[in-house]
Amino acid sequence: MXXXXGYLEFDGARQQSFLYPLFFREYIYVLAYDQGLNRLNRNRSIFLENADYDKKYSSLIVKRLILRMYEQNRLIIPTKGLNKNLGHTNLFYYQMISVLFAVIVEIPFSLRLGSSFEGKKLKKSYNLQSIHSIFPFLEDKFSHFNYVLDVLIPYPIHLEILVQTLRYRVKDASSLHFFRFCLYEYCNWKNFYSKKKSILNPRFLLFLYNSHVCEYESIFFFLRKRSSHLRSTSYEVFFERILFYGKIQHFLKVFINNFPAILGLLKDPFLHYVRYHGKCILATKDTPLLMNKWKYYFVNLWQCYFSVWFQSQKVNINKLSKDNLEFLGYLSSLRLNPLVVRSQMLENSFLIDNVRIKLDSKIPISSIIGSLAKDKFCNVLGHPISKATWTDSSDSDILNRFVRICRNISHYYSGSSKKKNLYRIKYILRLCCVKTLARKHKSTVRAFLKRLGSGLLEEFLTGEDQVLSLIFQRSDYASKRLYRVRVWYLDILYLNDLVNHE
């Protein structure tokens, strides 16, 4: 995005107001094309999606698209219509436009972010980007909480909501009208958020979703900071961002325990908010009454402001001492560790019972076995079976696939408090690998292992197992300590798919 600023020919004040002319500049398409080739997911660029076209024809495709946008009557053609002379459907051209949107609409955000960092010496810390970086924070904070609000963030049900969300940040009316026109003209709503079937660019989908969530969080944090200034006896909810205290839309009442209670929010300094994978959690030390108020606050926020039918069942109140919280692939809960301390004062000695509260992170073995069974690594009971679809590959390729999957799982779930379930998953993958190789060579598992020896299974020894085995000596006490130790890695930036080993 820093390269995009060099191409722009007007100052920063005009960049945020005039984005629409950029759709008719060929160098912007070249910029999007270069970024499409350098994406981490290794997908092919949309400009070379058609196998009949070589790289030298990409500029010709761009010129044809710009001519179609100048002549809007030619752009409004049913997506099923095919221009045989050009060899492309309008659907293909709209995919190119979505790539352009993904680049152009990020320009005002990147400029605003760069201006906010001017004059500040900030060090880049890639450790904070890791998924595992949140777990040490939870271990330190969750022991002081008793309730967690688990909220499923809903998607907008109407395209106009997305346009209105962008209206607060993109001031160019022409680009917004063009954006609205393309969405209503070509977008298939059923496949809008499906990355495999959607006609939109995945990067643009991610930008739309982040804008939608950013709008929700800005309102939530705004009300959260000012909740202590609102009266608890007659509380009226203001949802509009413009003239916030001047517009009254809804007057809410919540009936709890057969008594009418006005929905008033009390300021809680021990409130922590975490968002992940389309969900968010709200951890606090409030009472059940206040947690119910927060629950109905979220329901009314989505229904009144975003016009989304949001059911109260999508907001769960979990008590950490009793319920398990499904968080980033772990089952987290609070565990009470009783401790007995002997104290002696002068000639008298007595025992002191103490209880320590620790965060217990467990592996959801049932869901993982279900995922392995769905991908044909085992059956629904967890018994390993051969991977029939991989028997056409070479032995080294099969072994590398299983080793990579096993190491990814072991790497991510190294923070579990008990390793028994992790060892079971490793056992399933190891035996599945042996059965797959034995099936390929038309042999039994016992005969195959006898012929190759135990060196085959040593490939599954992960790097963290080797390091921990060097730190702790081989003894009964050390093995128990190794069984309980938790390791959080700060290099995990995304959740690896079990089968996606590319």
Swiss-Prot record:
The cross-references to InterPro entries, in alphabetical order and at most eight, read: Domain_X, Maturase_MatK, Maturase_MatK_N
Q: Name one Pfam family in it.
A: MatK_N
Annotated GO MF terms: RNA binding
Report if keyword RNA-binding is assigned: yes
Per UniProt, the keywords (alphabetical) are: Chloroplast, mRNA processing, Plastid, RNA-binding, tRNA processing
**GO cellular component, as recorded:** chloroplast
- List the subcellular locations: Plastid, Chloroplast
Could you tell me the Gene Ontology terms of the biological process aspect for this record?
A: mRNA processing; RNA splicing; tRNA processing
Disulfide cysteine pairs (residue numbers): none
Report whether Chloroplast shows up as a keyword of the record. yes
Query: What does it do?
Result: Usually encoded in the trnK tRNA gene intron. Probably assists in splicing its own and other chloroplast group II introns.
Q: Which family does it belong to?
A: Belongs to the intron maturase 2 family. MatK subfamily.
Name the UniProt record assigns to this protein: Maturase K
Q: Which organism is it from?
A: Sisymbrium irio (London rocket)
Ranked from the top, the taxonomy reads:
Eukaryota, Viridiplantae, Streptophyta, Embryophyta, Tracheophyta
Gene for this chain: matK
